Amino acid sequence: MENIIMRNNLRQEIVTFGCRLNIYESEIIRKNLELSGLDNVAIFNTCAVTKSAEKQARQAIRKAKKNNPDLKIIVTGCSAQANPKMYGNMSEVDKVIGNEEKLLSHYYQITDQKISVNDIMSVKETACHLVSSFDGKSRAFIQVQNGCDHNCTFCIIPYVRGKSRSIPIGTIVAQVKHLVLKGFKEVVITGVDVTAYGSDLPGSPTFAQMIKRVLKLVPELKRMRLSSIDIAEIDDELFELIAYSERIMPHFHISVQSGDDMILKRMKRRHNRASVIEFCQKLRAIRPEVSFGADIIAGFPTETNEMFENTRKLILEAELQYLHVFPYSEREGTPAARMPQVPQNIRKERAKILRQDGFNQLNEFFKRHIGQKVELLIENNNIAHTENFIPVKLDKYLAIGQIFKAELVGIEEGYMKCVLV
């Protein structure tokens, strides 16, 4: 899992691991950190999805302290929320704060109280923070929701993010308007379980209703991108919206996890393999250019070779291109951790095979797009992305954050090449 590092002139550094919501929250941390005036400090915004993510964070902390012995280190994020004592016991760490505390700057001060992590399950509302810029990024992130009310057997996210809490539509609209005025052409709608949006708000507005309001009230917004969506929560209204709204980008990341129905049942997922295939095929029939990403767990407890092959078949049948594959990682206290485990070496081997399957699917997707006319959103390092999230390598500098028309002409090392038109 790649970490993102942000620095400024005050010798303040933020190292972000994990999801898009963490990226969004790191921008809030950056703003608060600048206001705090703290010098020679690093905040590690951690992830708790896998043991590997936690190991990466600990290694990065030790390396940072070794390189700068006077550096003050604050650890926060989902891993800190789940295991505050683990970080509190590290000699390199000066302060540990929870997921709610990290958004409040007074918790950044180094005091005798090394750990400040409160009960996230008691939080009833998600505070709204206006983020005006995203360091070095061409697209902006909008948080519409936090927390999760589901109980997948492998997941600890509900325990580190709390119950599902939604941000009112009016507040979201105001934020999007603000970001458009700042020059952003694309916003990414993000949260922990975005398609669960609204059930806790007065009148229970749906995710689709919220998206419609944003698109209607901010006509200047050119591109909207949705983060991970849950197949089980896609109703007819939402499907119609993403199928026919050209301003919603034709790239959707699905929380699939497995292509075997028995494994999905043991995970306590609310969809089956047929519903994934049906959704992808139905949407592709309307928007042929659409691409799909998916989270896949390799080697979930009790997964047999036949069950694993069902997942491989699903990738082909649903035509999933952008795969996030993780070897199953036991999370203490979860029901899945008590199930019969698949050996580690088999998990890793299956993950390797799935990643290759994903690479093959993506390469075929690239080939089908040679000669296609697209619009590119320009990013850092001469990289851009198409509407359906194909990464494109540019041969010259173009203004970051702007949109250019181009023709895709070839493939080169995981990217497509283009000529401007």
From Swiss-Prot:
* Reactions catalysed: N(6)-L-threonylcarbamoyladenosine(37) in tRNA + (sulfur carrier)-SH + AH2 + 2 S-adenosyl-L-methionine = 2-methylsulfanyl-N(6)-L-threonylcarbamoyladenosine(37) in tRNA + (sulfur carrier)-H + 5'-deoxyadenosine + L-methionine + A + S-adenosyl-L-homocysteine + 2 H(+)
What CDD domains does the database record attribute to this sequence?
Radical_SAM
Can you say where in the cell this protein is located? Answer: Cytoplasm
Q: What is its main location?
A: cytoplasm
InterPro entries of this UniProt entry?
Answer: Elp3/MiaA/NifB-like_rSAM (IPR006638), Methylthiotransferase (IPR005839), Methylthiotransferase_CS (IPR020612), Methylthiotransferase_N (IPR013848), Methylthiotransferase_N_sf (IPR038135), MiaB-like_bact (IPR006467), rSAM (IPR007197), rSAM_horseshoe (IPR023404)
Which GO molecular function terms does the record list? 4 iron, 4 sulfur cluster binding; metal ion binding; N6-threonylcarbomyladenosine methylthiotransferase activity; tRNA (N(6)-L-threonylcarbamoyladenosine(37)-C(2))-methylthiotransferase
According to the record, cofactor stoichiometry and binding are noted as: Binds 2 [4Fe-4S] clusters. One cluster is coordinated with 3 cysteines and an exchangeable S-adenosyl-L-methionine.
User: Coiled-coil segments, which residues?
Assistant: none
Query: Enzyme class, one word?
Result: transferase
Q: Name one GO cellular component term.
A: cytoplasm
Q: Where does [4Fe-4S] cluster 2 bind?
A: 148, 152, 155
Which domain of life, per UniProt? Answer: Bacteria
Describe the location of the MTTase N-terminal domain by residue ranges. Answer: 10-112
Cofactor(s) it depends on: [4Fe-4S] cluster
Q: Which EC number(s) does UniProt give?
A: 2.8.4.5
What this protein is reported to do is described as: Catalyzes the methylthiolation of N6-threonylcarbamoyladenosine (t(6)A), leading to the formation of 2-methylthio-N6-threonylcarbamoyladenosine (ms(2)t(6)A) at position 37 in tRNAs that read codons beginning with adenine.
Q: To which protein family does this belong? A: Belongs to the methylthiotransferase family. MtaB subfamily.
Q: What is this protein called?
A: Threonylcarbamoyladenosine tRNA methylthiotransferase MtaB
Organism listed in the record: Rickettsia prowazekii (strain Madrid E)
The organism's lineage is:
Bacteria, Pseudomonadati, Pseudomonadota, Alphaproteobacteria, Rickettsiales
